[in-house]
């Protein structure tokens, strides 16, 4: 027996009952970004593999273990994007968007792909909304991005469910000095490290700070801290960021072990986390990447950005029960028509109502059927009113107008009076 067709593990369908919450989140954030002066950019899903190897970094879990990579028919190595920043930087460089110090404030949304173990809140195809800013080096733009996300949580009704964790990774020189000290400390305790952390000792030792293994975290209690190796400029940048967050009353926690999972970050690093989703508690993360553009062959260009996971945010909205009820509102009107003349009249009336009453949710019966079957479908649809058209109604240019959710009587309404009558009924609800 052939295997039934189904979605690939970790790549999920987003069903009709789920999409209203997705659209609500995306629409809310798009409106917020527009108000802050950010422009949308749309990026390809496929990029040359080299882009991510150079940008994210060899030795990272993303590059070494998680990328979907293949050779195309020309022998080119292509990768389905595991994140959005590298592709956005590539687009900015390719199209000269940051030339001459021009400030770019961009956002994008779409699917990303990583070969990870699927679990609640973590999938192999997942969706992100990302924001990237170029040619602004100061802490003021870092603060703006964090405040922007804070405002989104407020709009969505989840501000009390998330916590901001903040850190500075310093300059590349400061990180190099700290890396040397951390490696020396951990080398003496190498055999006590978990296997993954032992591997990271030679590839990306700073990522050991982010280990979820309790025994490794216990070893790190006495480890040197990055803040002891910071340069004065990075300290000033971090103090400037904190001062701006303090000025607007945005609370945060300093987490010196927050290093983010990608190699390109420097100075500011931040995450918004929640304790409502179990192990997958990070719903948004980002930071500064001043060296990434030059790493791709461009001129040194300050950059900062963040990405948020749409699946996790939707899950958090559901967990907190803050999805507006009107997102799943039923139809306002269901049109029943009996006979071809009535079906034609119903179609014309429906379009007239859609033009007259913006935002109306109107269903026209499809597939004919008896009066009983059409009325049954009208009731099942959840519509508030039914519109009834038969031969007599068409001949007299009237409709039967029947409430379905209260005890009101059916009325006969002239076609010309219908838009005004229906609008008045909808306004009363």
Curated annotation (Swiss-Prot):
Organism: Pseudomonas paraeruginosa (strain DSM 24068 / PA7) (Pseudomonas aeruginosa (strain PA7))
Entry's localization field: Cytoplasm
EC numbers: 6.1.1.21
GO cellular component: cytoplasm
GO BP, sorted A to Z: histidyl-tRNA aminoacylation
Self-association state and partner proteins as the record states: Homodimer.
Alphabetic keyword roster: Aminoacyl-tRNA synthetase, ATP-binding, Cytoplasm, Ligase, Nucleotide-binding, Protein biosynthesis
Record gene name: hisS
Catalytic activity reported: tRNA(His) + L-histidine + ATP = L-histidyl-tRNA(His) + AMP + diphosphate + H(+)
Class of the enzyme per the UniProt entry, highest EC level: ligase
Protein name: Histidine--tRNA ligase
A GO MF term: histidine-tRNA ligase activity
Record family assignment: Belongs to the class-II aminoacyl-tRNA synthetase family.
